[in-house]
Amino acid sequence: MKISREEVEHVAFLARLELTEEELVTNTEQLNSILDYAAMLEKLNTDDIKPTAHAVPLHNVLREDQVKPSMAREKVLANAPDAQDGFFKVPRIV
């Protein structure tokens, strides 16, 4: 499968990119090179390869939540520009 110059121009238009003539040629060549490499990978015999979902055999590596001592709420809120009901008060965004 080859990508044509027109396809690169179309994708650039959709992405709102203004490519020079040189960039069009370069991007077309690079994309075709990537597709050629992907085509080579399709030809590999993977019958003896076990299917995997992850490249690294890690499982859940999260730790348990643990409450640790921290600053008192009053001390933290004392540094806030504005606080209300024990929380930081911030300007409404939406």
UniProtKB/Swiss-Prot annotation:
It catalyses: L-glutamyl-tRNA(Gln) + L-glutamine + ATP + H2O = L-glutaminyl-tRNA(Gln) + L-glutamate + ADP + phosphate + H(+); L-aspartyl-tRNA(Asn) + L-glutamine + ATP + H2O = L-asparaginyl-tRNA(Asn) + L-glutamate + ADP + phosphate + 2 H(+). The lineage of its organism: Bacteria, Bacillati, Bacillota, Clostridia, Eubacteriales. It comes from the Bacteria. This is Aspartyl/glutamyl-tRNA(Asn/Gln) amidotransferase subunit C. The keyword Nucleotide-binding applies. InterPro entries: Asp/Glu-ADT_sf_sub_c, GatC. Allows the formation of correctly charged Asn-tRNA(Asn) or Gln-tRNA(Gln) through the transamidation of misacylated Asp-tRNA(Asn) or Glu-tRNA(Gln) in organisms which lack either or both of asparaginyl-tRNA or glutaminyl-tRNA synthetases. The reaction takes place in the presence of glutamine and ATP through an activated phospho-Asp-tRNA(Asn) or phospho-Glu-tRNA(Gln). PANTHER family: GLUTAMYL-TRNA(GLN) AMIDOTRANSFERASE SUBUNIT C, MITOCHONDRIAL. GO terms for biological process: glutaminyl-tRNAGln biosynthesis via transamidation; regulation of translational fidelity; translation. The keyword Metal-binding does not apply. Transmembrane segments: none annotated. Signal peptide: none annotated. Heterotrimer of A, B and C subunits. Keywords: ATP-binding, Ligase, Nucleotide-binding, Protein biosynthesis. GO terms for molecular function: asparaginyl-tRNA synthase (glutamine-hydrolyzing) activity; ATP binding; glutaminyl-tRNA synthase (glutamine-hydrolyzing) activity. Pfam families: GatC. NCBIfam families: gatC. It is an enzyme of class 6 (ligase). The gene is gatC. Belongs to the GatC family.
